[in-house]
């Protein structure tokens, strides 16, 4: 059981880090582009960065939340994490076209926060439920 807890904790930490990276990217890139409008920094605003982060966040989150649920049996927590992931997917794929930059930014920040919160709680509940 302790090996499963280790992999769950590692996945939770990675997902929290990636979620925060996504949120920071969303907040900092417009500021950096306004302060330093050079061609080098313009690649930071590329939408492929959002998709790349999603391709990392989704499997890590599914893995970690699934294994955490096996330990703590809290399906609500998994549903919260999946909701955050769905908001991130919506923000990356549709929000900009539907509501502009502000909807995309708001959705990304909301989704990232929900994903990070679900993994922080998954980490906490897995530790308290595990009798290793």
What is the meaning of each model-derived region?
Residues 14-37, 127:
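Functional transmembrane helices that embed catalytic/metal-coordinating motifs
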Residues 1-13, 39, 43-132:
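Secretory/periplasmic and organellar redox-cofactor proteins
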């Amino acid at each position: 059981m302790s090996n499963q807890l280790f992999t769950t904790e590692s996945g939770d930490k990675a997902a929290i880090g990636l979620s925060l990276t996504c949120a920071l990217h969303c907040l900092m890139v417009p500021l950096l582009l306004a302060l330093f409008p050079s061609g080098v920094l313009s690649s930071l605003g590329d939408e492929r960065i959002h998709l790349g982060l999603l391709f990392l966040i989704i499997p890590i989150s599914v893995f970690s939340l699934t294994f955490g649920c096996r330990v703590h049996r809290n399906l609500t927590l998994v549903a919260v994490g999946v909701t955050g992931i769905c908001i991130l997917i919506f923000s990356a794929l549709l929000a900009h076209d539907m509501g502009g930059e502000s909807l995309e930014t708001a959705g990304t920040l909301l989704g990232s926060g929900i994903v990070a919160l679900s993994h922080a709680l998954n980490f906490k509940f897995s530790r308290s439920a595990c009798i290793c």
